[in-house]
Amino acid sequence: MKKLLKLLAIFLLFSSIVSSSAMASSTRTVTDMTGEKVKIPNKVNRVADLWHANNQVVLLLGGQNKLVATTPLVKKQHWFTVVGPKIVKVAAPLAGNQIQVEELVKTKPDVVIASDQAQIKESRQAKLPTINAMYTDFTGLKKSVTLTANVLGGNSPRIARQYNKELTNNINLVKQHLKSCESTPTVLHIVNSTDLTKVDGQKTIVNEWIKLAGGKNAISKKENQISVTPEELSKANPDIIIVGSTSTAHARKALRANRQLNQLKAVRENKVYGNPQGTFPWDRYSAEEALQVLWAAKTLHPQEMKNVNMVSEVQKFYQKYYHYNLTAKQAKQILAGEN
């Protein structure tokens, strides 16, 4: 009897070791953008992406079929639905910025990707492996793309390396073209046409591409999406105005109709532009920042960037990463901010 019990104990111990080993080998640990170590399945098949901008990264990396949850905003992005029409059928378990936890859990995600701290906390409380992919500059963009690729696995890391190299090359191309340029136009970046006094200041990714493109931010205050007065904008009197999340035609119309702002130099000289919008707006947290740096430099310094054909650049990018052949007309619509 003692011998039997001893054998049983050995068997149970061995089974426990094998089970623990199998469990360990079925998961892996990734470090998110905040340094948090998150344990996720070795093979990720189901992704809940609660950060609008990162859905585009998943699409670019070839992981769209793994999306089981997205956001309502992403489902309304025209060019995203054109390039990846399956997105309209993906669940969107959000009410405003609030997670509908039960609905999120129902999607059975292997991993949740987010950027909002409150959402991340809620998701982790629901025992869902949750990764923070947030970034605030171009270096962070590259790291976030690499992180997302590592989560997705498969061919995604190779695509991420290709993309990061292209982003670096485009930045270097702009620097090369502008190295002898002496003018530095002042640029005002307005968040959207709904509130013309909400702008982007220093220490932002917007400020970073303005500088890369050979411009100077007209706003000296720091941070994203800050409110300023019409008087402050009049004092800044920018050479160029770029408005996010709208078309060039609508941006010009909105500023001309504003009695407090229609005498700004950029408005009078017709140097107002809607920021391009593709599968996601280019100006803020976007994988299409690789195109933004080229567009911004050409907008600020058309002569120095005359050899860069933006229609062709957009078409090549979409074919390479989204496997979608844009017409010249479609590329021009994206460049004009028509979404």
Functional labels for PLM-detected ranges:
Residues D49-T107, V111-D116:
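A short, structured surface patch at a secondary-structure boundary
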Residues R46-L50, V68-T71, V111-S115, T130-M134, ...:
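Structural recognition of the beta-strand scaffold that forms the well-ordered cores
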Residues T197-Q263, E269:
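Flexible, glycine-rich surface segments
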Residues I120-L196, K216-K221, S227, G274-E338:
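Extracytoplasmic substrate-binding proteins
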Residues Q98-K108, A126, V228-N237:
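Short helices/loops that flank or line small-molecule/ion binding pockets
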Residues V38-K43, V82-A92, L212-K222:
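A local structural motif
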Residues K2-M23:
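Sec-dependent N-terminal signal peptides of Gram-positive bacterial secreted proteins and lipoproteins
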Residues M33-G35, V90-E102, K222-P230:
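Short helix-initiation/N-cap motifs at beta->coil->alpha
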